[in-house]
Amino acid sequence: MDQDALISKEDSEVEREASGGRESLSDVIGFLDAVLSSEPTDIGGDRSWLHNTINTLQRPGSTHRAKGEGEGEVSTSSTQDNRSGEESRVSGGTSEPEAEAHARNVDKQNIHWATGRGASTDSVPQDLGNGRDSGILEDPPNEGGYPRSGAEDENREMAANPDKRGEDQAEGLPEEIRRSAPLPDEGEGRADNNGRGVESGSPHSARVTGVLVIPSPELEEAVLQRNKRRPANSGSRSLTPVVVPSTRSPPPDHDNSTRSPPRKPPTTQDEHTNPRNTPAVRIKDRRPPTGTRSAPDRPTDGYPTHPGPETDATKKGA
């Protein structure tokens, strides 16, 4: 019994769900039929009144007729239809004061900047909202009446006459150096630099081209005296030759090509017998006076011969 009751309840729930699904499907199908049965001309009807300008005025009681989707014609007042136009008009009215306030702020900033720099407000023109390029003009008019500088006038003349520079170069004239100091006087510069600059430093001047200034004798003497008074540098090496005491310079008429090599001084007998303990003693050169004959045992160079054992034996035998 209980199982039969449960089965009957389940069957009733399934039937309800199926009936609910059928009702929802029937509603959707009916809605689609209503949409498809409507004429396409009604969907794309005349809506030109939505694009009317804001300034156009309509009668307060004028109404517009519109068709809904299967609901028939509905009358709407002009105030409701033009609500979007009023909103746009309000937004436009609020945007205009904001633009004016922004322009006033920009003008105040320009005036403050110009007064701080000591210039007039006309020197900084501004274009707001016209679509043109804003900024400083290339050649602003001289409305204040201030005199222009010479460099600007020269630049304007050269810009107006571009062939002038080419003519000057073709004639061989030097190009002028603008904003440069004038050349000093020749006599004044000669007295100031003490003879160090005898030529002008500017090669572009046509007055000194090919001219050499010859210094005077007085100027040369002054330069020589100044160089003599200048102290010698202690760090420089001396140019005097260093004389070695052990060497002798030859006489001026002596020929170096015929000079004989230096000879070794003779040694005594004591040096041969005991050269380590006995110091070497050099015999003085005893040259005979001029006009006398030299001894047979004395050589021509004045040095004595070595007294060996043979000479001693001959002397004893004699």
Swiss-Prot record:
Regions of compositional bias (Basic and acidic residues) in chain numbering: 7-20, 99-110, 150-168
Keyword Secreted: no
Keywords tagged on the record: Phosphoprotein
Residue positions where Phosphoserine is found in the record: S249, S257, S260
Record region (Disordered): 1-24, 38-318
Comp. bias (Polar residues): 50-61
Other noteworthy facts: The P/V/C gene has two overlapping open reading frames. One encodes the P/V/W proteins and the other the C/Y proteins.
UniProt protein name: Protein W
Source species: Sendai virus (strain Hamamatsu)
